[in-house]
């Protein structure tokens, strides 16, 4: 996975014990996030705002606060983060750019004949997300 490569590039070996897996529902994330409390982690990256909100719900239930006790960064930057305080620092994918790239590829493939489409290699297109800094990270 990309995050594992990024960790290794910075001299950090990924630790599977620190990976928590959850469905993309707040209640599932609430249950899965209990593993965070068993670790010495002080920061969490959640793969969606819903997962981050489940984590926030658990932390608040345990009288822990963001960013005082844990820093939280999520991926989505959806409006869901307005349901909780503090607002989540988030990675935002440009959905317009993503849709344009998908349509461009689809139209290019539709213009090919059937045999060419079957032989076509997968396409990698890198879209640069942006970090939307809000209030859920404690600066060290």
Per-range role (PLM):
Residues 1-140:
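Bacterial carbohydrate/catabolite-sensing allosteric modules
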């Amino acid at each position: 996975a990309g995050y594992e490569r990024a960790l290794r590039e910075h001299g950090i070996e990924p630790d599977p014990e620190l990976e928590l897996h959850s469905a993309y529902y707040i209640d599932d994330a609430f249950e899965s996030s209990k593993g965070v409390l068993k670790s010495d982690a002080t920061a969490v990256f959640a793969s969606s705002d819903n997962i981050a909100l489940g984590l926030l719900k658990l932390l608040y239930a345990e009288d822990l606060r963001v960013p005082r006790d844990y820093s939280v960064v999520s991926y989505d930057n959806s409006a869901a983060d307005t349901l909780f305080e503090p607002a989540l620092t988030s990675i935002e994918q440009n959905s317009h750019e993503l849709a344009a790239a998908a349509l461009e590829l689809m139209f290019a493939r539709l213009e090919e004949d059937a045999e060419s489409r079957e032989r076509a290699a997968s396409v990698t297109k890198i879209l640069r997300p942006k970090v939307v800094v809000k209030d859920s990270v404690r600066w060290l």
